[in-house]
């Protein structure tokens, strides 16, 4: 009996999360057809996805008619909105919530049955107003709106963990001690940040290696995760073990120095982006390390979903295991 392929449309397809989802689904051509929404189909990132087999559709999230047309015929949509899009910083322009609501409404009009939405925890609510993070709070508000519609047969919110890819950006390394790019006066690559909070269970995520597979796993059987917040991560570890892993694979002097006594002592140098980083540490400390909300951090669902996705690949010698922090550092930084 021939299996019917399901059409999945990815909004934010050229971003880190969306690209990972597209690439994973394209490895299972008997299960899924992939449509990638982009503002610029001629961009290098979009063309890369086209070469791999994605069908490109040009559409802008600010235009309801374009979005409805882009979603036509789709069984499922993966939605991630770039919170750092400059359009959201214009006080006269639309907010991220406006975008999210418009896109969700368009998916409903188009008859989409399944929505996997990249969300965030309700930071202000969970910290009783002590800490606010615009991007997390807004994503959570969009999630609540999607829930309130009752329009989707399967609605799966997913929260990505702490991106390992953040370590690839040299520009901001100095604010956190220099790790993994700049040595300090004593010759160490120092990771100098506040404690995470609680039991120091940091959910590191390799977006490129694992996030797409985790979403892929959800789409294999979305009803199992309907209205459940999926925690997406590659490995749970603490900062001490993280820096030790880096030292072992690179041979470089590396250490973790906690900023004490609390997250409030972290110096953001008056930079708004770094203030958000500071608030993130505030959020996790104030919630005792519960980055994903009220539930404790747990990687079992991510492990299961990763394994399901790899089994769905048409051809693969890939391990069904999630990428470890050590293996990620070895690939990206070992000589």
Swiss-Prot record:
Residues 161-206 are annotated as: Interaction with ASS1. Transmembrane segments: none annotated. It comes from the Eukaryota. It is an enzyme of class 1 (oxidoreductase). GO terms for molecular function: oxidoreductase activity. GO terms for cellular component: nucleus. Keywords: NADP, Oxidoreductase. The keyword NADP applies. It holds the Pfam family NmrA. The keyword Iron does not apply. NADP(+) binds at residues 12-17, 39-43, 60-61, 81-88, 139, 163-166. Signal peptide: none annotated. Pathway: Secondary metabolite biosynthesis. Its EC number is 1.-.-.-. NmrA-like family domain-containing oxidoreductase; part of the gene cluster that mediates the biosynthesis of the indole diterpenes penitrems. The geranylgeranyl diphosphate (GGPP) synthase ptmG catalyzes the first step in penitrem biosynthesis via conversion of farnesyl pyrophosphate and isopentyl pyrophosphate into geranylgeranyl pyrophosphate (GGPP). Condensation of indole-3-glycerol phosphate with GGPP by the prenyl transferase ptmC then forms 3-geranylgeranylindole (3-GGI). PANTHER family: NITROGEN METABOLITE REPRESSION PROTEIN NMRA FAMILY MEMBER, NMRA-LIKE DOMAIN-CONTAINING PROTEIN. Belongs to the NmrA-type oxidoreductase family. This is NmrA-like family domain-containing oxidoreductase ptmS. The gene is ptmS.
């Amino acid at each position: 009996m021939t299996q019917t392929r399901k059409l999945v449309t990815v909004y934010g397809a050229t971003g880190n999360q969306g690209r990972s989802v597209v690439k994973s689904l394209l490895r299972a051509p008997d299960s899924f057809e992939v449509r990638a929404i982009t503002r610029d189909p001629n961009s290098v990132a979009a063309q890369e996805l086209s070469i791999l087999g994605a069908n490109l559709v040009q559409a802008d999230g600010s235009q309801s008619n374009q979005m409805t047309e882009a979603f036509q015929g789709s069984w499922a949509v993966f939605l991630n909105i770039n919170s750092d899009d400059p359009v959201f910083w214009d006080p006269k322009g639309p907010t991220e919530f406006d975008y999210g609501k418009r896109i969700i409404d368009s998916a409903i009009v188009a008859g989409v049955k399944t929505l996997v939405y990249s969300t965030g925890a309700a930071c202000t609510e969970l910290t009783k107003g002590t800490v606010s993070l615009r991007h997390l709070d807004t994503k959570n508000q969009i999630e609540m709106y999607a829930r309130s519609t009752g329009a989707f047969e399967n609605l799966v919110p997913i929260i990505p963990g702490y991106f390992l890819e953040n370590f690839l950006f040299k520009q901001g390394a100095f604010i956190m001690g220099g790790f993994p790019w700049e040595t300090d006066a004593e010759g160490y690559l120092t990771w100098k940040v506040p404690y995470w909070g609680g039991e120091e269970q940091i959910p590191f995520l390799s977006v490129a290696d694992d996030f797409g597979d985790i979403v892929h796993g959800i789409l294999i059987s979305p009803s199992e995760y309907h209205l459940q917040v999926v925690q997406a991560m590659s490995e749970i570890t603490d900062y001490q073990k993280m820096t030790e892993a880096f030292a072992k694979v690179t041979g470089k002097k590396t250490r973790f120095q906690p900023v004490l006594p609390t997250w409030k002592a972290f110096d953001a140098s008056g930079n708004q982006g770094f203030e958000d980083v500071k608030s993130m540490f505030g959020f996790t400390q104030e919630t005792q390390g519960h980055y994903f909300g009220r539930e404790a951090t747990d990687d079992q669902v991510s492990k299961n979903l990763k394994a399901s996705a790899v089994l769905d690949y048409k051809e693969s010698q890939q391990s069904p295991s999630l990428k470890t922090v050590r293996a990620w550092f070895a690939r990206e930084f070992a000589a």
